[in-house]
Structure formats: structure tokens, C-alpha cells
Amino acid sequence: MTKKPWERRLKDLSHLLKCCIDTYFDPELFRLNLNQFLQTARTVTFIIQKNKNQIIGYDIWYNNNVIEKWKNDPLMAWAKNSRNTIEKQGDLEMYSEAKATLISSYIEENDIEFITNESMLNIGIKKLVRLAQKKLPSYLTESSIIKSERRWVANTLKDYELLHALAIIYGRMYNCCNSLGIQINNPMGDDVISPTSFDSLFDEARRITYLKLKDYSISKLSFSMIQYDNKIIPEDIKERLKLVDKPKNITSTEELVDYTAKLAETTFLKDGYHIQTLIFYDKQFHPIDLINTTFEDQADKYIFWRYAADRAKITNAYGFIWISELWLRKASIYSNKPIHTMPIIDERLQVIGIDSNNNQKCISWKIVRENEEKKPTLEISTADSKHDEKPYFMRSVLKAIGGDVNTMNN
């Protein structure tokens, strides 16, 4: 089969998602595009079913990749029910709101929200600023942020902002078609837009901004997308990868962490550093998304890990691996100082992985710096069990992929 009609329909769906983004603040046009998106999403699987006689192994593939994967997915159930509502009863009931959120830690349950209409948003932000100044210790206020956004919410899906919900639905459809392309040995074309390619547009459409309380500066999350191209990878990097033996078949999070740790160690020893990297992977332990990032302060870390949680939902990740250089600081339980002011007692390179079943492994090395002229070296690695290492900063992502966040509590 050379032509894939379901893939053409998926491209239509990506266009409609872009239209929803572009018309987010035009209620009438957004309503029209939302309706058409939900109706078109349903037809992707209809077209696959229509062509089932041409798909070898269709029954097993469809059961594993559609029926089983979506049967307990509340968003896919909502999409199906919403299509029926649109076709038989009329438009979905939805409303717009403005929301300001005070974020002072990695723990989402500690957030304080102020939900109102758009004209009152600035008042809400001022109230949260005063609340933070009055109630939070100074060492927390310094790293706190206020996230403000405008959003559409459906009466039948109150826990999701609508654009985020549509992105997840598109991601499910994209993964379905991608899996089918592998099944028939005819991979998906590069011209089909990946779900994560819309991320920057989502933030822009929802007018998301972050107010840092340490200096009252306004920030936005910014990033660029780079498509993988084997031709542009330098030869020395390819040779470096050959130094690390890749297992023929990785079957666990622990094995994936072991292999990734070897790559990270080789990279650090060659370059003298390692960029902070987040990798999402699927149930077959194949990487499906990779993000490099930098942080200016503690507030940036809060922003990043909330964003990473949203991205994990869109990609339907099974697990994730985080590679970073980190400082260990001497902290007291009763300390009332910001983290960045605490004395540094050690420096490490760390690779940690965890999946939705809470299988976890962490490997770290002590970074040794003789002087500024020489590249740093690494002391022998140590492996930690999940009982030893509690990376609570990852809890929002673990929650997003369905893991037990209680394992992150000390």
C-alpha cells in the first residue's frame, strides 16, 4: 500500500488544530474549528477500518493500538461523546476564563489559583503578589512565580484547557497512524506535523506569561524545534557513539538507564560537560521525544517541569530519563535561606530514569576538577535504587504518565 488515506486525514486534523490555535480568541471561529476538529478526529479510525482488508495483521494491531490503548482514556471517550453531541444535539457548552496561579514549589497541590474573567486578571495577579508577600517566607518568595493565562474550558471537560485537550487527542491519533505505518512497513511521511510541534503556538494562543516575584520581570517559555537528520550529525559524534555497545534489545527502564548512562559518561569525558537533557520513551523503550534546556534560576525549573508534564501527556510517554550536572548543597531542615545560597559540597553528573510503573534507576558520578585548564574527569559511578533516590522535582511528570507520586515523598 503506497497511499495511506488515514495519513491524509491526519494531516487535515493537524490543519484544524492549527486553525483552533489561530482563532482561540474569536469565539465564533473557535467554535466552528473545534467542532470540525472533533468530527474529523473520529474519521481517522473510520478510514483505517475501511482499509482493513489491505492491512496484514489488522485485527491484532487494531486491538492493541486502538481498543486497548483508548478504552480507559477519558480524553478519547470525551472526543467520541463530543462528536455525537455536535452531530445530534448542537454545539458543546464552553466558557472562557482567565487564571492566575502562584507557584512556589514543584508540588502542584501547593499552587494557589485565582480564576476570574479576563478583565479582572490583573486584579487577580496583584492579589496573589500580596498573598505571596504576606504569607510565604522570603526564601520561597524569591523563587516563586505567578503564571497567567486565558483559556477555554468545556462544561463536560472541566479539568482540561481545551487546546491542551485537543493536542493530546491529536497526539493519540498521530501515534496510532505512526504505529500503523510501522505495521505495514510504510513509515509515516515527514510532512505530517508531530504533536509537540504545536507547543510554542499553544502558549502564544493562550497568552501565557510568568511573573517572577524576585524582580517582577515578565517571562515566557521559549524553545525551538529541530528535526532529526542523520546527515548533519558530525562524524566525530558518530564515531563516539560507536564506542558504546548498544544492547540488541532493551526490555526495561533499568537497562535503558544503563545504556543512556554510558552515552552520557562518554559525552562528558569528551566534551567536559553535558547539556541538561530530558528524554521521553514508549513502552517498547524507544525514545519518542528529547528536550535540551538551561535554567537561569529556581523559578525556571518550576516552569520547565510543569511544561514537561504537559508534553508527557501529549506524547503519551511511558517513562522518562533526565541527564544533568548538579550541585549537592549542605542544607539544614530548619534552614530559611534560598537553595542557591546554601554551600556547595559536591558536584555530580547524574542520569535518572523512571516509568509509569515506578521502576526507577539512578546512576551518578562525582565530577572532579583539577584546574580551569584541564577538562574535568569523573570518579567511578554509583547506582541508586528507588529507595535511596527521591527526585521530587520530577513528580509532576511522573503524575502525568500515571505513576505513583507518593514514591517521591520523603
Swiss-Prot record:
Domain of life: Viruses
Protein known as: Protein ea47
